[in-house]
UniProtKB/Swiss-Prot annotation:
The gene is PIP. Keywords: Disulfide bond, Glycoprotein, Pyrrolidone carboxylic acid, Secreted, Signal. This is Prolactin-inducible protein homolog. It comes from the Eukaryota. Coiled coil: none annotated. GO terms for biological process: detection of chemical stimulus involved in sensory perception of bitter taste; negative regulation of T cell apoptotic process; positive regulation of gene expression; proteolysis; regulation of immune system process. One of its GO terms (cellular component) is nucleus. Disulfide bonds join 65-91, 89-123. The modification Pyrrolidone carboxylic acid is found at residue 29. Belongs to the PIP family. InterPro entries: Ig-like_fold, Ig_E-set, PIP. It comes from Cavia porcellus (Guinea pig). It is found in: Secreted. Monomer. Interacts with AZGP1. Glycans are attached at residue 105.
Amino acid sequence: MLTFQFLFRASPATLLLTLYLQLGVITAQEDTRRTIILSTELPQEVTANELTTLKLKVETELRECMVIKAYLVSSKPLAGPFNYKYTGCLCSDYPRTFYWDFQTNSTVRIATVVDIIRELNICPDDQAVVPIKSNRYYAITDLTVN
């Protein structure tokens, strides 16, 4: 019976190792970073055919850089002198801000879309990652025309 008690008794080293492993797992679980963070600025109401600016700020909490393509998708056609698609390198220390100027004469729903893509000659030394989990992010806003 004494031998069984000796086998199942936890030594201080075993308890300490278990504590360190548990703390390591807890720290790893809390260390989740958001891939893409979108912030859009658009007035909620405008008058018909008024020039409107949509501002999109894109950030990441990942340590690696990514090549992104940002564009708009709308429920109705938009008119205006703007570039529909932007491509750039997004890094944690360098958030990107994109602007679109457009006009509309009716209420419209606009989706700002950011795709993470594989493209060369965008990020420095072509050092960029493409996440496995998801590569398309979007934010939907409504613009009411009076």
